[in-house]
């Protein structure tokens, strides 16, 4: 029996007709094999119709994975108390012959596939399987990658309808030519709160060879929403093989003089200011997380992989995040996850208003002072609690850029690190190679006391992508360098650091980043000059003073400028030593990396000879 004949036996007539309409034997074989293996009681195939999406939304409520809140279209979902984040220990890239890659949790492919198949055999008995079709990137475009998701979680399917563009018609259009990703997920057995029960058997395995990801015994979005960070591993590999970039970056529009629109991408490790940069109220957002960048006629063009936001809700407050706050209080479709609910209203940590002393949260019935099994006090919401919402509901979204099948020209790329004493607030690279190596490939994030218990530890995180890397870091960087060489017009590269401190005091205010963005926009078009330093170009005082007045209506003093933009030679040299040591331990790193780092070291040493350890920007401007 061929796959279609098997599917005709497995599906009811209506669902079978939906699958049959897609002329792709490879898809049919995949569906037949997994429906037979998972043994669901019922299968629902989603087309692009609003009715099918509505069915999934209803099933999330019907099966108890989501519950309605007071505001229309708002629902809440809870994950198991111990299923609240990406499970790094049980997430592995499957590689043949037990191959290993630096910084990546790998597993022998044959072993991994055998284990996951055993865990998934018959796991959907008594459950409904949803077959959903989506695309990564805008539809019918150079960026489009089709994907099919199998899941028994209506919550996961519902999340994907909010976050991704529907792809059923795209599968029909592409037919046999579709090179599609596959995702197979089961939440496994559920407890009385409808959360995954068998967390000891939680596995997330990424099979690069078949471009398939398996996820089992988990519901948390980062482990289960196939098209997000799971697909990201697949697209990184595809991009390296095909010569484009799949990046952990926001995509935003910065509005320049006389109505000029300039687009920037930005890669920042967590807690480094990525979302707050992308959400500056008077600029425009295209995407907050993942960006594809392709070379088109010698120009780098970027597109948002997604169409929605799966955002961290902790700390969202009306003063610092007016746009997100406004969206979260509108009657638009939103899934809140792992927040506190009292009388149908959601509450979360550090929201800037009074939080009730009791209610329900990810731990079940909650009261202030409640402790978990380990004796830790349980906060009102989990620190990784989320909101899932479509970007179309953001007043500052650039819809035209979001849906443009040609993407937008990338004028600048920003790498955002976090340290108290090394990088200046903003600088521009001398050229593509210098930016890729001394900014992107050298990205570090200084941990705060809250995250690791040790303040001031610098975590190496090149391009903010290390957690999701699926190829050798050397191959990834080689592709980056090559990508720039292919372009007739390379985006300018910038590095930012919002976290400088002196004697324990912050040197910058939260909104100063709005000024750095405007300066970068002017530099992309050559509208202002800059000061050449050993580590790149920095702004001139007069330009920043004008921008602070224009953008923030603030006086900007020469003292502030000097403190922020002095070149800190000892710290910069120590950083080069750290980064070089890391890359020396890896094989297969482009030789160019060491050459560019050495050139920077020599420039710093020469400058120290002339000016000393700490160099005023005014001294360099006078040259």
UniProtKB/Swiss-Prot annotation:
The gene is pckG. NCBIfam families: PRK04210.1. GO terms for cellular component: cytosol. One of its GO terms (molecular function) is phosphoenolpyruvate carboxykinase (GTP) activity. Optimum temperature is 80 degrees Celsius. Thermostable. Half-life at the optimal temperature is 53 minutes. It catalyses: oxaloacetate + GTP = phosphoenolpyruvate + GDP + CO2. InterPro entries: PEP_carboxykin_GTP_CS, PEP_carboxykinase_C, PEP_carboxykinase_GTP, PEP_carboxykinase_GTP_C, PEP_carboxykinase_GTP_N, PEP_carboxykinase_N. Belongs to the phosphoenolpyruvate carboxykinase [GTP] family. Homotetramer. Mn(2+) binds at residues 229, 248, 289. This is Phosphoenolpyruvate carboxykinase [GTP]. It comes from the Archaea. Keywords: Cytoplasm, Decarboxylase, Gluconeogenesis, GTP-binding, Lyase, Manganese, Metal-binding, Nucleotide-binding. One of its GO terms (biological process) is response to starvation. The active site is at 272. GTP binds at residues 271-276, 386, 418. HAMAP family: PEPCK_GTP. Its EC number is 4.1.1.32. Optimum pH is 7. Involved in the gluconeogenesis. Catalyzes the conversion of oxaloacetate (OAA) to phosphoenolpyruvate (PEP), the rate-limiting step in the metabolic pathway that produces glucose from lactate and other precursors derived from the citric acid cycle. PROSITE patterns: PEPCK_GTP. The keyword Nucleotide-binding applies. Gene3D superfamilies: 3.90.228.20, Phosphoenolpyruvate Carboxykinase, domain 1 (3.40.449.10), Phosphoenolpyruvate Carboxykinase, domain 2 (2.170.8.10). Pathway: Carbohydrate biosynthesis; gluconeogenesis. Substrate binds at residues 86, 220-222, 270, 384-386.
